[in-house]
Amino acid sequence: MRSAALILMLIVPLGQIAHAGGAACVMAKYQGQTLDYALVYGQSHPDEAQEAALAELRRKGYADHGRHLDLMRAQNLSNLDRAYVIVIRSEFRDRRGKARSAMGCGFSEDSYRDAELDAVRDLQAYFWGWKPDLHGYELVRRFQY
């Protein structure tokens, strides 16, 4: 009886892991500018969503590393089955006066407001000099999956 309960406790979490959702927001960047993004959701795991988003950016022509692209980077991943999603963009000048652009993606299972806060945090995590109250941002995309 005791071993049956232990087996059941192990099976339930594995079943929850197997049914996790997957979403990824990947950015194409060049010399301090965010050129484009790809947002993929509905995959079985965030890694699969990330690979699909990278492939989408490659199809758009962002695979030419060295000449026209610094990198493609997954900025935010989610394992939520359902989520509120916000994508933001900011164009601003850094402390040296250089024009910059940056984007952030946010996910939340609770609300658009929480997804927006996650998008702001995401943008700050990848561009430390960006301040939302100083530089501002615009809403690019807002939806649920």
Where in this protein do the model-derived segments appear?
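Secreted/extracellular ectodomain signature
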Residues: 19-145
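Bacterial N-terminal signal peptides
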Residues: 5-15
